[in-house]
Amino acid sequence: MSLALLFINFLLFPFDIDINCLNCSNQNSFSVLLITETKDWVHDSIESGIDLIVDIGDKKNFNVYHSDDSKVITTENLKEFNSIIFLNTTGDILNNYEQKVMENFIKNGKGFVGVHAASDTEYEWQWYGDLVGAYFMNHSGIVDRKIFTVDNTHIMTEHLNPEWNIVDEWYNFKYISDNINVLLKLDDASYDGGEHPHNQPLTWYQEYDGGRSFYTALGHAKEVFKDERFIELLEKGILYASNEDY
């Protein structure tokens, strides 16, 4: 980070624990906190995801603060953010204090975005499972699959065809919340390893416990983060969770 960017970062938000701002500008209208901590599998697409989210921030005029350590989740720090993004996090990454801070953050009307392995995180914290909307169970290999757009009149999916294909790893879930509003789904009957025949949710949004949540199971393969259809989907998901205009 340049000295100029460090200085802008300090002037904008003098955090009680240091957080790296990847694109800070006093011209940006809001900020998001990007978390990439892992206690289990580490996805090699994390850097691709970080780069994409910074690009989206530059395009939509928001600051992206990043950490791979959940200790930055404090009451004081979170006052500055519209939403938290968990990008391919895995395992039990938050302590009891950080969990409570995050709960209060959502209850105060803020937002959450989960990408891919965010559902492979915090299995012993059911509030989080409901925030994400599901818990990961197992996955297929990296294969080409057909995706069904449940409602392509919705603003988050209006750019997508009713049916489209993409190559990625595909999740089965051991828990799926009844509260989610499904945007994209798969037909599990069409491939070996599917465990939700004809109705496997892939991407969804919800209002939850006073705040907003957006999750997509896409995002294992690096190439997904270069796909224009996914890029626009994630952009709109971040803006939805952040309660900002599209």
Question: How should these model regions be labeled?
Answer:
Residues 134, 139-210:
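Catalytic beta-strand/loop cores that center a nucleophilic Ser/Cys/Thr
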Residues 92-159:
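A glycine-rich, often tryptophan-bearing local segment used as a flexible ligand/cofactor-contacting loop or short
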Residues 128-136, 166, 175-181, 219, ...:
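Oxidoreductase and adenylate-handling cofactor-binding alpha/beta cores
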Residues 17-30, 36, 59-62, 68, ...:
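Extracellular ligand-binding/catalytic regions of CAZymes and related secreted enzymes
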Residues 25-28, 58, 76-80, 95, ...:
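Extracellular/periplasmic catalytic domains that process cell-envelope and extracellular macromolecules
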Residues 117, 187, 218:
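Active-site donor-binding loop signature of nucleotide-sugar glycosyltransferases
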Residues 31-120:
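Helical hinge/lid and interdomain linker segments adjacent to catalytic or ligand-binding clefts
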Residues 1-27:
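Bacterial Sec-dependent N-terminal signal peptides
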